[in-house]
Amino acid sequence: MVWFKHAAWRIGVIYEIVPKNQQTANSEADDDQYYFRIAQLGHAVLNLPNVVKESGDMRPFLTFSVPASQNDFTGQSFASINWQNLVTQRRQNSDQATVRLDLQTLGLEASKMAARAINNSFSVFNRLDDPQPDLGYNVHSYGGLFFGAELINLNDPVRVKPPNYADSSRDSDGKKKTAVMLVKRILVDASNRLFFRGPVYLLIRQPLATQTAGEHQDTLLAEEISFRNSLLSETDAQSGRWTWFQLESAAAERVEKEAYGRFYLSHKLLKAINPAEYQQSVAARQLKEPTAWVNSRVENGAGAADLGCQRNRRVAIGASVVEGVGIQLPESIREEGET
């Protein structure tokens, strides 16, 4: 699920990724070498057209906050509203210009509510083993999941709640320090509760980095550190270089609400969403905490019910897109809801 530029910014679900040429199809290419087919969020009865976008026209869902719903929809869920009745009522107006405007407004409200609902759900794929006793309950282990707007695989870095003793750490702008888990296990118990396990790292500056630092364990974390340290002057570097300090071992665990979403490279994210601020940061040789430019999953789902575990991604998306849209997943992904 992403924001995409379409006169104004709108929310949609990528349902197919198409290479621009045959060479791209046979290689690991950057995002700008693909077209992205997107189903606009709203409701199926609105029959919103699908669109095709390039990577430069999209932003991660968690980079923008979802605007509040109009008063008429406050306190209601996407699934509880009779969207067909609302569409029928608006089409009874004899002024077609008013009808078009009213349906556009209704579609916008539906998209906001649908986005929060999808954000507050998850669905798992690629089961790895049979149920096993673990901490007193049976659990299944998985290779990945759709976590709200995002796809997360094992070994991906995910922003998480720091341990209590480090949770008050903040940068000079008042933003919380960034804690990241390298996800080694994705677990769902018999009550469909979700858990992540893996080592947790905190982004800090210190004189020396140990071999257990996060940049030695993950290429994305290494790139974050490399760019930040490249901004340091020789004098600044003497007082400490950036590193991912290990806070917790691979046995560390976070429940669903303590996982905030994927970790995004600060410089690439900032360059995409605010090029002017990116240039200013490079010139000043200072880069804010990654939390400055991306929300948590909990923040973007505020006000909507927690839908929890869904059978598969298409079920989670439900009636929020036009009928007939199928999600084209890589062959490597096998969802729990498949028969």
Question: Which positions does each model-derived feature cover?
Answer:
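Eukaryotic chromatin- and chromosome-associated nuclear factors
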Residues: 1-339
